[in-house]
Amino acid sequence: MNRHADVPVIDISGLSGNDMDVKKDIAARIDRACRGSGFFYAANHGVDLAALQKFTTDWHMAMSPEEKWELAIRAYNPANPRNRNGYYMAVEGKKANESFCYLNPSFDADHATIKAGLPSHEVNIWPDEARHPGMRRFYEAYFSDVFDVAAVILRGFAIALGREESFFERHFSMDDTLSAVSLIRYPFLENYPPLKLGPDGEKLSFEHHQDVSLITVLYQTAIPNLQVETAEGYLDIPVSDEHFLVNCGTYMAHITNGYYPAPVHRVKYINAERLSIPFFANLSHASAIDPFAPPPYAPARGNPTVSYGDYLQHGLLDLIRANGQT
């Protein structure tokens, strides 16, 4: 029998209320989870995840190979200028999963960051509306919804870190967030590409990594696949398709001087049709939070201040170098 990591379910609704005692209790639970396995489930978030699953499943099944190629990012289709927004292709015999990544809907041709040509900023392209009616509207609304969930969760992190609950708000705004949503499909295949093995012999669909984000807010189909590295080895993360799975990214680890580490996790091989839809909660390009840690935690040497734009650009490149193009 596989062993499971301790991943608590935390009701986050109280973080939107006015009772500070309730907020402090939720923050304490977030603190224990992130200092433990590194993961927790956020319950009572207010998002219709069943609708998200159905819409995304139907959309993936309706996409033609020609559409995928036209939307493919530069790593797959050199004719396209985009590096983040677009389609991430499956590669026969090498890579089974495929995905579509989209960015902040606020980024348009007139946005100051787009005009400035800042790295990691792109105006979203979308599949043809006639073939996929309502897709853009649905996913732009979802971006707003999950952004709001992340903002609520960040109130809990701020309280847990001994700061004002609004601590992250000036850095995390819909106007200029570098956040992204990936609509990842892991298909069932009769002839699955060759698999890599973990050091413990586990067959893997995606190797060990840490998320390049402040926090990650994930919806996934209720099929066991994620594992987290612990002192006891890799443990399965329990599944739920009713709650969001939340973990810290490497920027949270950086600004807390390791108080909240970014958990090392991996995707084990399961040959089943399933979805993974992470929201990578990112700050703005210019945001730079001076690293700190709550007392009595006091590292011998603190981390340097790094702007979020530089962090994200280098972090994504490092992830590709280590694990290959997703």
From Swiss-Prot:
Which sites bind 2-oxoglutarate?
274
Residue ranges annotated for the Fe2OG dioxygenase domain, each copy included: 183-283
Classification via Gene3D superfamilies: B-lactam Antibiotic, Isopenicillin N Synthase, Chain
Coiled coil feature spans: none
Enumerate the residues binding N-[(5S)-5-amino-5-carboxypentanoyl]-L-cysteinyl-D-valine. Answer: 84, 88, 186, 209, 211, 276
Sequence intervals crossing the membrane: none
| PANTHER family (alphabetical) | OXOGLUTARATE/IRON-DEPENDENT DIOXYGENASE
Q: Which cofactor does it need?
A: Fe cation; L-ascorbate
Gene (UniProt)? pcbC
Its function?
Removes, in the presence of oxygen, 4 hydrogen atoms from delta-L-(alpha-aminoadipyl)-L-cysteinyl-D-valine (ACV) to form the azetidinone and thiazolidine rings of isopenicillin.
PROSITE patterns in the record: FE2OG_OXY, IPNS_1, IPNS_2
Q: Which family does it belong to?
A: Belongs to the iron/ascorbate-dependent oxidoreductase family.
- Enzyme Commission number: 1.21.3.1
The residues listed in the UniProt record as binding isopenicillin N, with positions renumbered to this chain, are 84, 88, 186, 276
Pathway annotation: Antibiotic biosynthesis; penicillin G biosynthesis; penicillin G from L-alpha-aminoadipate and L-cysteine and L-valine: step 2/3
InterPro entries assigned? DIOX_N, IPNS-like_FE2OG_OXY, IPNS-like_sf, Isopenicillin-N_synth_CS, Oxoglu/Fe-dep_dioxygenase_dom, Plant_2OG-oxidoreductases
Query: Which residues of the sequence carry a binding annotation for Fe(2+)?
Result: 209, 211, 265
Name the chemical reaction catalysed here.
N-[(5S)-5-amino-5-carboxypentanoyl]-L-cysteinyl-D-valine + O2 = isopenicillin N + 2 H2O
One Gene Ontology BP term is: antibiotic biosynthetic process
Write down what this protein is called.
Isopenicillin N synthase
UniProt entry keywords in alphabetical sequence: Antibiotic biosynthesis, Iron, Metal-binding, Oxidoreductase, Vitamin C
- Any one GO molecular-function label of the UniProt entry: isopenicillin-N synthase activity
Identify the domain of life. Answer: Bacteria
Keyword Protein transport: yes or no?
A: no
